[in-house]
Amino acid sequence: KWIMVGRLDVNTSGLLIFSNNGDLVQKLSHPSSAIKRYYLCRVFGNPKKSQIKKLLNGVEIDGNKSCFDEIIPMKKKTNAKNNWFKVSLHSGKNREVRKLWETESLQVSRLIRIGFGPIELPEDLKKGQYRCLEKNAVERVIKLTGMEG
């Protein structure tokens, strides 16, 4: 039986990971695993440096402190209606990326998960396609959890 690691909400696309090892899925999915997730975000508007700083230092969401580990602008356009950012965070709470931006009154208009720990979404992999991980990639993922291979 294949089990999905975490999930993507209805308005998010990108990398999905499946495994037939329930213990591994549990360890990878749980927020306490602190495995970095990487996303491309299209944000409506032009965030100020002060807003970016707040999102990196931490804001309160649903009674808990949350922050991005990094926010990297992609092709900065000062007068653009939308701007793309590569972001990473180490927890996987429900809609966390969107909620973080929303604390600064910024709306995410597109969200794509491009990485989960050492696994990256291949650029040549089209929507709806899949690819099995190489053995060394599986071993790196297992090592992240502290499980034996």
In which residue ranges do the predicted regions lie?
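Basic, flexible Lys/Arg- and Gly-enriched helix-loop patches that mediate nucleic-acid binding at interfaces
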Residues: 1-149
